[in-house]
Amino acid sequence: MRRRSPGKTHLPRKILLAATVLIWLGAFQRVSGQSFFTLVPCRLEVICLLPPEFDTSNDLEHEFCDQLAERLASEQGPAWRVSVAPPSLEDRAILRAALRRDLNFDPPTSWRKLALRDKVAVVAVRRSGLGWHILARDWDVRVERLGPLVEKTVPTWSDVPEAAAESVRQALVPVARIRLVEQQAVRLDLQGSLLMAERPTLPGRLFLTLARYEDRDGNARAVVPLPWTILQSPEGPPAEDGSVSCQVISGLKNPLSARRRGRVQLLAWAVTPQVRPVTISLKNRQAPQNPLVGYEVLAQPGGEGSPQFLGRTDFAGQVEVPAEDPPGWKLLWVRHGRRVLAKVPLVDGSNEFTELALPDDDPRLLAEGYLMSVQDQLVDLVTLRSVLIARLRARIANGDWDQAIRLRDQLLQLKSREIFSSELTQQQQRLLCPDPVGQKQIDKMFEETRRLVNLYLNPREVEELVKEIAMKAPRRSDTP
């Protein structure tokens, strides 16, 4: 009986193993460009708060929950893992608080455990005069935020399950992980996007940016929104890897690429603009952080076109920013004198960021006003000086020495370059700005004014005319 060589026996296995590794690496390379987040289904826990008459009938309550779960599961398939259940007795007060408007919601500790769920959707069904009123709201465990409240009214009970499912779908706020691509461009990896039957399209959608700081167990130590930074997705379909490209719009320099210690996730939370005004407050960056009064606020809708003047801050440092119709986002300009202090994005109707800390620009504005008056004086002086020099040359050419001497004396009595420079130096020493950028601009404005003074008040031309008169004019006799 012939025996095979051990090397030949294991050779096909090695080839098969190598091929398997190559295939796995190829698949890993395709996925590693994005995040595995796109392959992870969203664990959605729906809690139904039904009318009191359902408390006496567990069958009706469970039947409604089963119908709702079936409708939600059929919508996204493997992208969602849905569980629907009625609340416990102790959870009812918490659920009612989650459905109130404009309330600081303090969720139970279990709602902050990312190991248990990704989202909690609260649904309440109530009787109304027109039939049945449905409310739904999303609590996202990853960003620890409540979404907007969704409300619907249907006439009959048979319409409630479908309306409740639609309310939940509308209430769920998209959350994504941010993947840095370029300094002003990122990609968003939406949870479970590669598991969806249809890739999500988010044309022109706006996102707030947040940093989630985690402990060793994956629980959030803090979820901090990045101030004055939004993301905007372009028109068009998503990429093949399920990600969505976005433009970074921020009033900060490199807001996403800053170094952060520990386990940190950069997340995007979709926000919907609203048609309602927002009041912006400006305050001094340095203690005691007094309000900044009289600062101009301008707006560029969509960041395009010429800035439109909105108003000046009042005694409290506040100004109201109206919303556009249809609502979107705008780029706010804060200007003081001729200096633009900030350009920050604002989503219409969003009260996420309403306070902007800026350097006190009053010393720089005082310097600007003073130097503008100095330049006005300089223009008047140069004009008068030029007229006197022209007349003096004409009198010298005609030999009218009496008039020439009178014009010479008028020229010598004008403010000289040295006096201008001395006044500028004294005033510059008095104007000190606590803001380094503002102080740098003050110094630059003074240097520019000195350059103009030295350029247009050159004494050489006047000195030459004085010498010419001294040489050519007849000397007056001291005796009659």
Feature map (PLM): residue ranges:
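Short beta-strand elements
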Residues: 343-367
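Conserved, compact domain cores that house catalytic/ligand-binding motifs in diverse enzymes
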Residues: 283-316, 320-329, 371-466
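Bacterial N-terminal signal peptides that target proteins for export
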Residues: 2-17
